[in-house]
Every structure is written in C-alpha cells, then in structure tokens.
C-alpha cells in the first residue's frame, strides 16, 4: 500500500515546484486550494469531474486576477495540482471543453447536456463543483443578474446529485469573497498607479534640477 502523504508533504512538494514569494493578497487562495486539493486527494469517492475542473479554473482565475508577474499564475496552479496528485493540464483541457460545450446549447438542450455532468451516486462533493455549475450557467445564459444565476444553480443542483443546501451556502460565500477580492485588486492597482505617478514626478523634478 502506498504511503499516505500528509499536508506537510504536499506543502513541501508545492514549495519545491513553486519557489517564489506569493504576495499577501494571493497567499490565502494558494493556501486554501493547497489544503482543499490535499484533502480531496485522500477522498476515495472523489471524482475530478468536469464540474470540478470548471470550478477549479474559475476560482483560481477569479482570485489570482492582477497577479504579477503575469507568467506566475500558470506555474502556481501547476504546483498546487502536482503537489497533490492532480494533472493541471488535463483539468484545464476538461474545463475549457466543458465551457465551450455550454456556450453551444440552447436553454432546453443545455439542461439535458448538463445532466451528463451529474455527480455519480456516492461520489464526494466539493464546493468547486458548485462554482463550476455556476460558471457553466454564466457561459450558457444571457442572464446578467448574479443572484438569479445562483438561485438557478441551486435548483439545478438537485438534478445533478449535488447537495442543494451546501451548493447555496458555497455559492453565497464564493460571491461575497469574489466581490471583496475585486475591491482589493482595484485598491492595489490604484496604489501601484499612485506610486508610479509619484516616482515619475520625482524623476521629472530631478531631471529639471539637473538641467537647471
């Protein structure tokens, strides 16, 4: 029987795969996903289905917006996955394929197609599946009201074998955290822009002083 990896093992493997400093704004999502993927890797009944793949892609992209340098997020996701036995390329391809399929269906056809993504009997639920369902609804619908989309996701979750109460709670938390993240990124970008303007002003003043 293979040795069971601990969270310390996963963290060690992660830092070896991603030996970069993570800014405080993004450290929380990195820590949360590392722990979540670690726990899921030990769930015998967990299946990394399409809903999970879309949810992981959505959560990661939502909470790493504004990340610098721009080439680091891909490496960060790869490290989070590989340190817990997941294949990030396979998951990204599954998510992209699923999102493209969702965009190509009419409303009725979408619901029929969506049932193909149902959770198998007895399979372990992950909050990322709820986010994946919401993302598929966003991709397939012209509906722009976030609350309406969440309510629809909760209703559809029953037919997909997902626990509706947990889906509702998980999507409410996801929505709230997304709003806070957007505000934090906006504030960070405004602060960086202000710092750049101050630096440019100092350089201009120094140049004028030298010229004079």
UniProtKB/Swiss-Prot annotation:
A GO biological process held by the record: photosystem II assembly
One Pfam family cited in the UniProt record for this chain: ThylakoidFormat
Keyword Coiled coil: yes
Leader peptide range in chain numbering: none
Keywords of this entry: Coiled coil
Entry GO CC: plasma membrane-derived thylakoid photosystem II
InterPro entries, A to Z: Thf1 (IPR017499)
DNA-binding listed as a keyword: no
Disulfide bond residue pairs: none
Coiled coil regions in record: 179-201
Entry-linked NCBIfam families: PS_II_psb29
The family this protein is said to belong to: Belongs to the THF1 family.
Chain's role: May be involved in photosynthetic membrane biogenesis.
Protein name (record): Protein Thf1
Taxon lineage: Bacteria, Bacillati, Cyanobacteriota, Cyanophyceae, Synechococcales
